[in-house]
Amino acid sequence: MSSSGSKVFPTFRVVIVYEDFRTAAQAKRAYDFLAANLTHEWQLTSQMWKFELLRIPELRDMAAEDAAMANLIIVSCHGDQELPADVTDWVEMWQGDKGEPVALVALFDRPPEQAQHARTTQAYLERVAKRGRMEFFTWPEGLPELEILVPDRASVTAAEPLCQAA
């Protein structure tokens, strides 16, 4: 409880990086689904970054800071080309700075077998997740049940003062 008597919920942070409007809309639908189904014991926040913005070093740094604090990171793309170097540079910036990550999601707008570079992107992000001891999921092949993505309430009790300060 806060000093005003209202209950303070821990923050569940989502960072979305996306290729274009279509992939942003797809990621937003996934976020909205999460928001609609996430237990009401969490305050859900999101940051969205377009691939193009990661070309600018200062913005890439800001996006990396956001990702380092995130519980869930979604990379939304078509998969018809390799991830741009600016995006992989961004991934390498935050992946070593993760505290207690929950999940990394590769979100494609078509099945990976229908996109020339989706499997390469998927494999790269899966390696990143493994190095960072994160859960890894890909879509449209199937996301897990929602409760897998949400940290155990007891595991964040100690972090609640940090969540409140953020």
Residue ranges and their predicted role:
Residues 16-18, 49-50, 73-78, 104-109:
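Conserved beta-strand segments of the P-loop GTPase G domain that flank and frequently precede/overlap
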Residues 1-37:
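A short, flexible N-terminal coil/short beta segment enriched in small residues
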Residues 37-54:
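A short beta-strand-loop structural module common to alpha/beta enzyme folds
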Residues 21-23, 53-56, 75-84, 110-115:
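Short acidic, S/G/P-rich loop/turn micro-motifs used as interaction or catalytic elements
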Residues 59-62:
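Short acidic active-site motifs
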Residues 89-131:
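Ser/Thr/Gly-rich flexible loops in soluble cytosolic domains mediating phosphotransfer, phosphorylation
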Residues 128-166:
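Glycine-rich, aromatic-bearing surface loops/beta-hairpins
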